[in-house]
Amino acid sequence: MSARKMLLICIAAVPHWACSQSTGDQTNDGLRTITDPFEANALIAKSVNLGNALEAPAEGEWGVTLKAEYFELIKSAGFTGVRVPIRWSAHARIDPPFTVDGSFFDRIDWVVEQVRNNDLAAVLNIHHYDELFAQPAEQKTRFLALWRQIAEHYQNADPEIMFEILNEPHDQLTPQLWNQYLAEALSVIRESNPHRTVVVGTAEWGGIGSVDRLEVPPNEPNLIVTVHYYNPFQFTHQGAEWVEGSDAWLGTTWDGTTSEQQAVDDDFSRVVSWANEHGLPVFLGEFGSYRTADPDSRHRWTKYVAQAAGSRNFSWAYWEFCAGFGLYDPDTGEWNTGLIQALFPVN
């Protein structure tokens, strides 16, 4: 069969995002794969979160509706990937078999298509599954059913499309319980995606403090570990409306003193030690500071954290694109040049 005929069959049979002609390893069924998690991690080396859009109860409810031009802007700014927070639990039935709305899958398909059209990589996650955090035992079956559907739906997607099992487990989903749930979710994903890169995070809000309590399944060759970083919290979240008492922190600066830098280094060294012990790459899946902070401090902190991550071969994703922590103002069509220069310094 000619290459042209095979391409036409691919276009007719599956979505555009599943027909990449990029080079790479292939499985027996012809699917391109990336089986080295360090190689996959390099694809998301410099990423941005598409926050406040698809993880809202409904897209647009938190002020962000994704547009095709956003992906073009992200690519042109120098980013290599996006992290896509998604509240799947708001778009699936609450009774068995917990079916995900077809129209919502269509919307995520569109996102994946924009990602690949712009030669970006993406991490798709389950975000803000609040019911699971509050009642893990009652929600476990639904959680696994969501992943079975997501995994099967994207089993033919390009390997640049990665899965992240759950954003920031916390509350009743304890570290011990999370280790159990992530292993079971990973097993479900592997039924249809034996080679796809999967990202796993820490319990207790995804922070570095619980990395030592994270247990990854043995003999799992294609995992990336992710942590989030918002230290010092009173700086990054000063004036955040959803954080009680944060107005009292207004005016907190980050001056880049030796001790401030050392605190970042010490935190990241802890992650490096764990990752080296387990032989896994690291994805700094969220870091950012709220818009009410002093601009110069925001720039200094962002630059130092990004460079500290990069120097340790962490990939990173800034939180986030165009909302309260954002890099881009959709009303003016302008980037926050100070933050962009912090992430992509000239020297």
Predicted regions and their residues:
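Bacterial N-terminal signal peptides that target proteins for export
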Residues: M1-L7
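N-terminal carbohydrate-binding accessory modules
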Residues: Q21-R83, F98-T99, V272-W274, A342
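Aromatic-rich peripheral "rim/lid" segments of glycoside hydrolase catalytic domains that contact
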Residues: D294-N347
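Acidic/histidine-rich helix-loop elements
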Residues: L50-L66, A90-D101, Q234-A263
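Active-site region of glycoside hydrolase catalytic domains
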Residues: L144-S259, D265-Y290, S311-F314
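An active-site-proximal structural segment forming one wall of the substrate-binding cleft
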Residues: V64, F71-T80, P97-H128, L132-M162, ...
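C-terminal motif of bacterial Sec signal peptides marking the signal peptidase cleavage site
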Residues: W17-A18
